[in-house]
């Protein structure tokens, strides 16, 4: 891809500006520290960047995808990520790998087969939504209320957390049209240190970080080594590593709850294009700054490692 290309970037990053500049600045900083050039593909530039990329005028050795719509193949960011993968750019994460992992209906049976604890689930295809009826067996399996999620949904859009009947499927489908919907038993986390035992675990090219994530208030706090030991939270790492091995994903987070019975249940399987809003910018829903910085560093290191191997 290098012959005839006017401009080559070591690392490009797609971004929809749905976070603050802290993560972007840390990526830029770490690139500068290890002598990688960098380009931020913002909405204002994406059409032109795509055109130049398509015509072979620019190329990126690595592309960090922080924004593309899996459910909208016509989306310009989606098309750019696919084009980059076709042009042998190292994409974090490759679009086919990311889509397969992000598709909850597709991943759910694989997790079950791998003996990873997930909520009891019924999968309903879009074509069945209008005429679907819960059997008595279904009602026992799901309990009441139960949760409904679109297979390719994110950001809670289309999620119904207080479903009581099949009629609630229409609410989810109206909010987020999708090919499939998951009806799931609602998992209630136990309480530890006056907070829900609910965690967001980040996997970034073999490195793992753990956050307490309050599923009722959205607040994050990094788990300490002492807490990991005191509360027996070591299974969190094993679970996220198994999910990484199963999916082939290199950068994602998983939401995991611990129940009163002590079981660790994976609630939200794979979140790619992780939310990197910093806590200093938004204390209510932001990720701790030191964690955002550490993830940015590991991503840049991984890009450099791949570039070195490719040369």
What positions do the PLM features span?
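Short acidic/polar capping segments at secondary-structure boundaries
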Residues: 97-98, 125-129, 151-155, 165-167, ...
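A short glycine-rich, hydrophobically flanked beta-strand micro-motif that places a catalytic Asp/Glu
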Residues: 249-261
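Conserved N-proximal alpha/beta basic substrate-recognition cap immediately N-terminal to
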Residues: 16-130
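Extreme N-terminal starter segment of soluble prokaryotic enzymes
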Residues: 1-13
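Phosphate-binding site of ATP-dependent enzymes
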Residues: 160-247
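ATP-grasp fold ATP-binding core
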Residues: 111-112, 138-157, 178-193
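C-terminal active-site "lid" helix and adjoining low-complexity regulatory extension at the edge
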Residues: 258-311
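Protein kinase-like catalytic core scaffold
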Residues: 146, 209-210, 252, 265-268
């Amino acid at each position: 891809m290098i012959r005839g290309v006017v401009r080559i970037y070591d690392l490009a990053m797609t971004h929809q500006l749905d976070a603050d500049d802290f993560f972007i600045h840390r990526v830029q900083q770490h690139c500068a520290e290890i002598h990688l050039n960098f380009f931020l593909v913002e909405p204002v530039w994406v059409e032109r960047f795509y055109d130049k990329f398509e015509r072979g005028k620019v190329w990126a050795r690595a592309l960090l995808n922080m924004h593309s719509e899996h459910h909208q193949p016509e989306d310009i960011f989606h098309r750019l990520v696919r084009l980059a993968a076709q042009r042998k750019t190292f994409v974090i994460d490759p679009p086919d790998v990311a889509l397969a992992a992000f598709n909850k209906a597709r991943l759910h049976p694989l997790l079950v087969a791998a003996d990873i604890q997930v909520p009891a689930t019924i999968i309903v295809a879009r074509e069945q939504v209008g005429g679907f009826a819960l059997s008595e067996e279904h009602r026992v399996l799901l309990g009441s209320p139960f949760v409904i999620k679109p297979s390719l949904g994110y950001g809670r859009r289309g999620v119904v957390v207080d479903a009581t009947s099949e009629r609630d499927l229409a609410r989810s489908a109206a909010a987020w049209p999708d090919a499939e919907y998951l009806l799931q038993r609602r998992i209630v986390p136990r309480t530890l240190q006056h907070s829900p035992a609910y965690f967001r675990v980040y996997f970034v090219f073999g490195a793992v970080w753990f956050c307490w994530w309050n599923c009722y208030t959205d607040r994050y706090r990094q788990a300490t080594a002492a807490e990991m030991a005191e509360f027996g939270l070591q299974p969190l790492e094993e679970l996220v590593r198994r999910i990484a091995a199963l999916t082939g994903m290199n950068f994602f987070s998983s939401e995991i709850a611990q129940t009163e019975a002590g079981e660790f249940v994976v609630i939200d399987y794979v979140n790619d294009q992780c939310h990197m809003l910093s806590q200093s910018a938004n204390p209510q829903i932001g990720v701790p700054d030191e964690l955002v910085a550490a993830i940015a560093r590991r991503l840049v290191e991984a890009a450099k490692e791949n570039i070195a191997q490719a040369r």
